């Protein structure tokens, strides 16, 4: 799959994964259209990071869509009455940081945007190895959404489908950090923490996964 001179809509949250996807697309000489969402999340700082990453990689266009999922809550990320779990990733248990239908909604909006501007791909930072177990980050979900996308829009019906591009799907977090380093992602400008504080909490799942991977990456780097 070549991205050179192709148009791609990247769901850019400002975190490590989506920033790395943006860097890969940039290195591949794609025309990048960044899309982020102000969805009532408590960690709105990620929107500033997304804007910073968009400017860093000088992408074609960057939009922030207002879509308030906090109106019905259902997640500790959109309902401040719920506590963000800090006990670490639980096996076979989906944490309350899961936002009901979030990826389905976001990818659907990205699909509409991509079709409107005649983009060829939608870039997603989903990762099925070092993650919190969200159902909408899994390979089978991506496969089924691609089938839906092919049926649900004009380009799909004309046998010129918009493809979901998930370059990080089978990578662990340590490998993603290495890729980010190779592609000059300013990691200090990205935001992964679920809390709405000024600095990363270091306790939520997202912080734990990222920090553990970074320590492994640093340890391996120092061994070389």
UniProtKB/Swiss-Prot annotation:
It comes from the Bacteria. One of its GO terms (molecular function) is ligase activity, forming carbon-nitrogen bonds. The keyword Cell membrane does not apply. Its cofactor is Zn(2+). Binds 1 zinc ion per subunit. InterPro entries: QueC, Rossmann-like_a/b/a_fold. It is an enzyme of class 6 (ligase). It catalyses: 7-carboxy-7-deazaguanine + NH4(+) + ATP = 7-cyano-7-deazaguanine + ADP + phosphate + H2O + H(+). CDD domains: QueC-like. Its EC number is 6.3.4.20. GO terms for biological process: queuosine biosynthetic process. Zn(2+) binds at residues 193, 201, 204, 207. NCBIfam families: 7-cyano-7-deazaguanine synthase QueC. HAMAP family: QueC. Catalyzes the ATP-dependent conversion of 7-carboxy-7-deazaguanine (CDG) to 7-cyano-7-deazaguanine (preQ(0)). This is 7-cyano-7-deazaguanine synthase. The gene is queC.
């Amino acid at each position: 799959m070549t991205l050179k001179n192709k148009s791609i809509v990247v769901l850019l949250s400002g975190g490590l994964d989506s920033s790395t996807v943006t860097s890969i697309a940039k290195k591949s000489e794609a025309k990048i259209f960044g899309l982020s969402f102000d969805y009532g999340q408590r960690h709105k700082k990620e929107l500033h990071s997304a804007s910073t990453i968009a400017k860093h990689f000088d992408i074609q266009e960057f939009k922030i869509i207002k879509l308030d999922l906090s109106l019905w809550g259902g997640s500790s990320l959109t309902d401040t009455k719920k506590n963000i779990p800090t006990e670490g990733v639980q096996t076979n248990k989906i944490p309350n940081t899961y936002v009901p239908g979030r990826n389905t909604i976001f990818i659907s909006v990205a699909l509409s945007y991509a079709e409107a501007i005649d983009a060829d791909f939608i870039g997603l930072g989903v990762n099925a190895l070092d993650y919190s177990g969200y159902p909408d980050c899994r390979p089978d979900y991506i496969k089924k959404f691609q089938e839906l996308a092919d049926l649900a829009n004009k380009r799909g019906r004309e046998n010129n489908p918009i493809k979901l591009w998930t370059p990080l799907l089978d990578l662990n977090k340590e490998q993603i950090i290495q890729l980010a380093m190779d592609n000059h992602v300013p990691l200090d400008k990205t935001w992964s923490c679920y809390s709405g504080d000024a600095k990363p909490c270091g306790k939520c799942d997202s912080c734990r996964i990222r920090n553990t991977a970074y320590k492994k990456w640093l340890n391996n780097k120092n061994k070389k």
